[in-house]
């Protein structure tokens, strides 16, 4: 076997999947999807074809042309990270039909009961497939190397509607013939064609990596905010929908700016779905339908910077994709650079510089986090036997950004813009590795390897000496005020009069990891940071309070951990409680997780469990 990806059973000598046609019946009563997957390969194949699955039960594998069974086997011992290998024995076929069902514990899916939604009347389900969770929804070659087009026929309750990372084709009644293969998986046509059911059809015509497969089903409403953009939320969440429409009103301007910088927008639509608070990420760049946490809605338009990041992925990450997660920086480093270029034009250079400053602080914090695991401080790092969710960090984002910025600084912005457009045009709809990028870089910028130590940047540990810490008046002022706090001086009201969330975030992140409890409480008494509506500020302050042994804030910490599921907030707060705290803090961490666990997405559950098992 010649693996193409340390996180997949896919064999590089096998043909890759090019198209998947899915029929999906969503059963909200059991939290199970009954489905069939028609996989089309790049060429006919004879031999053992390896597929990735996780917690999937296969009823049968058929030749779609003859409907004759195709032999297959399922590994008896699941791999802790990769899941369960399914080996299908093909005899010259170029396609195969798999009838299967998912598990209630599918790692990509979070099923919400009616009581967990705004209306309290209807259930909700959504996906999160990055990095390696598409395999828990359908059998596939779950690697970014296998770019797929897909069609979906989705059967859902008629009181609900669906959105996907795909073009919506139509909503219609079900027909019995669609269920004939699913009957082998114990789902009859009577259920498929139930009076309370409806079918939604979708099509994704551009080839995408499997981790960008996405859907959400619930009672959804939307607002038009631009010619290419709708904002969706639960229809009962009127206040959230109104606030989101206001927060993201400038989206079309950002799309136009992205097109000026990086070339045509290839995905037609750029819609946004604000998910329930349990969504584990800030945003997910699913093409045509970006998923967002409600915590990015801050009321001052700064949440649009998350949208700028997901928009930038439309070129770097979605058009050009890392071939596997060892090269994740190719997705996120370029996208962080592209995001800041968009923000610089739309919101101003000062805001972009603040972004860089916050990122710089985050990068230095990650160096401390990984001081005993330096492999994780490399851009191109080895991940054999490593769960990508466990080592998710700011390194590929911020060190990757620094590397891209280093190239721009070397050749100048005008030349770099030309290079970037050529890079995107050359590799669009392809998945590449670091070496491919470096060879392209050296071919198009002759002598660059003599000016920049490319190997040190991509394979070296830590932060290279020629990285760039931002310089601006506001950045320097905030860093200076943070240093003064160490000496017992609090910022005056004049100092912070024009601060928004980003300024406070930068300030808090540059304070000592722990302070005198009286200092922390005095800061909060004056500026009410623990009550901030901006979770970046609130969580940064609460993290400081926990590490400073300010137990007066335990109630607010508990409340925060129970109302949001974004891992950016769960990780630092649970780590602070478990690692920096005493017996009381460790007990609080265990208690809160026990109470909140079922409200978190399965990916977030796994991350918190890993933190608690490490420190408690």
UniProtKB/Swiss-Prot annotation:
Q: Which GO terms describe its molecular function?
A: epoxide hydrolase activity; metallopeptidase activity; zinc ion binding
One GO term (biological process): proteolysis
- Tell me where on the tree of life, at the top rank, the source sits: Eukaryota
Q: How is the cofactor bound?
A: Binds 1 zinc ion per subunit.
**Where is it found, in Gene Ontology cellular component terms?**
cytosol
Q: Where in or outside the cell is it found?
A: Cytoplasm
Show the active-site residues: 310, 397
Q: Which residues bind substrate?
A: 128-130, 282-286, 566-568
What are the binding positions for Zn(2+) in this chain?
309, 313, 332
User: What Enzyme Commission number(s) does the record list for this chain?
Assistant: 3.4.11.-, 3.3.2.10
UniProtKB keywords: Cytoplasm, Hydrolase, Leukotriene biosynthesis, Metal-binding, Metalloprotease, Protease, Zinc
> What Gene3D superfamilies does this protein's entry cite?
3.30.2010.30, Neutral Protease Domain 2 (1.10.390.10), Peptidase M1, leukotriene A4 hydrolase/aminopeptidase C-terminal domain (1.25.40.320), tricorn interacting facor f3 domain (2.60.40.1730)
Q: Which reaction does it catalyse?
A: an epoxide + H2O = an ethanediol
Q: Which InterPro entries match?
A: Aminopeptidase_N-like_N, Aminopeptidase_N-like_N_sf, ARM-type_fold, LTA4H_cat, M1_LTA-4_hydro/amino_C_sf, M1_LTA4H, Peptidase_M1, Peptidase_M1_C
Cofactor(s) required for function per UniProt: Zn(2+)
SMART domains in the record: Leuk-A4-hydro_C
Q: Does Protease appear among the keywords?
A: yes
Q: What does this protein do?
A: Aminopeptidase that preferentially cleaves di- and tripeptides. Also has low epoxide hydrolase activity (in vitro). Can hydrolyze the epoxide leukotriene LTA(4) but it forms preferentially 5,6-dihydroxy-7,9,11,14-eicosatetraenoic acid rather than the cytokine leukotriene B(4) as the product compared to the homologous mammalian enzyme (in vitro).
The text of the family note is: Belongs to the peptidase M1 family.
Q: What is the protein name stated in its UniProt record? A: Leucine aminopeptidase
Its gene name is LKHA4
């Amino acid at each position: 076997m010649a693996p193409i990806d340390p996180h997949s059973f896919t064999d590089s000598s096998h043909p890759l999947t090019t198209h998947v046609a899915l029929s999906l019946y969503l059963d909200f009563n059991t939290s199970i999807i009954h489905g069939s997957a028609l996989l089309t390969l790049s060429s006919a194949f004879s031999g053992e074809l390896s597929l990735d699955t996780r917690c999937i039960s296969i009823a049968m594998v058929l030749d779609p042309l003859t409907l004759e069974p195709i032999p297959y086997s399922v590994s008896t011992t699941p791999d802790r990270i990769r899941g369960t290998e399914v080996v299908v024995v093909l005899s010259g076929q170029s396609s195969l039909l798999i009838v299967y069902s998912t598990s209630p514990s599918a790692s990509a899916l979070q099923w919400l009961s009616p009581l967990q939604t705004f209306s309290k009347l209807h259930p909700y389900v959504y996906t999160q497939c990055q990095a390696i969770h598409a395999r828990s929804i359908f059998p596939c070659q779950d690697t970014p190397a296998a770019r797929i087009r897909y069609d979906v026929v989705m059967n859902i309750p008629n009181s609900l509607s669906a959105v996907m990372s795909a073009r919506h084709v139509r909503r219609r009644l079900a027909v019995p013939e669609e269920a004939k293969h699913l009957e082998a998986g114990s789902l009859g046509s009577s259920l498929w064609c139930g009076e309370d059911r409806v079918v939604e059809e979708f099509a994704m015509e551009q080839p995408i990596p499997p981790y960008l497969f996405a859907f959400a089903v619930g009672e959804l409403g939307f607002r038009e905010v631009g010619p290419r953009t709708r904002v969706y939320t639960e229809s009962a969440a009127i206040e959230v929908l109104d606030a989101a429409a206001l927060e993201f009103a400038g989206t079309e301007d950002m799309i136009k700016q992205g097109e000026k910088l990086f070339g045509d927008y290839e995905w037609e639509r750029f819609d946004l779905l604000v998910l329930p608070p349990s969504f584990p990420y800030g945003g997910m760049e699913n093409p045509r339908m970006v998923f967002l946490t409600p915590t990015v809605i801050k009321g001052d338009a700064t949440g649009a910077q998350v949208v700028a990041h997901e928009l930038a992925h439309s070129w770097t990450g979605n058009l050009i994709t890392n071939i596997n997660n060892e090269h994740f920086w190719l997705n996120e480093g370029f996208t962080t650079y592209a995001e800041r270029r968009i923000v610089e034009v739309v919101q101003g250079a000062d805001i972009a510089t603040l972004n860089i400053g916050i990122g710089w602080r985050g990068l230095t914090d990650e160096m401390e986090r990984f001081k005993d695991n330096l492999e994780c401080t490399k851009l191109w790092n080895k991940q054999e036997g490593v769960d990508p969710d466990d080592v998710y960090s700011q390194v590929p984002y911020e060190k990757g950004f620094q590397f891209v910025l280093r190239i721009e600084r070397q050749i100048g912005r005008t030349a770099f813009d030309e290079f970037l457009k050529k890079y995107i045009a050359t590799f669009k709809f392809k998945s590449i590795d670091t070496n491919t990028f470096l060879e392209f870089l050296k071919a198009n910028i002759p002598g660059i390897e003599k000016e920049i130590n490319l190997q040190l940047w991509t394979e070296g540990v830590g932060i290279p000496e020629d990285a760039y810490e931002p310089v601006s008046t506001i950045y320097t002022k905030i860093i200076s005020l943070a240093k003064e706090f160490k000496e017992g001086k609090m910022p005056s009201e004049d100092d912070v009069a024009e601060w928004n969330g980003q300024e406070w975030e930068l300030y808090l992140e540059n304070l000592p990891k722990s302070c005198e409890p009286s200092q922390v409480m005095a800061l909060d008494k004056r500026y009410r940071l623990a009550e901030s509506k901006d979770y970046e500020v609130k969580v940064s302050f609460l993290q400081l309070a926990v590490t400073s042994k300010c137990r007066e804030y335990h109630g607010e910490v508990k409340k925060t951990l129970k109302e949001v599921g974004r891992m950016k907030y769960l990780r630092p707060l649970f780590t602070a409680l478990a690692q920096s705290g005493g017996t009381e803090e460790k007990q609080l961490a265990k208690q809160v997780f026990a109470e909140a666990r079922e409200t978190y997405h399965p990916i977030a559950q796994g991350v918190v469990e890993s933190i608690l098992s490490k420190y408690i």
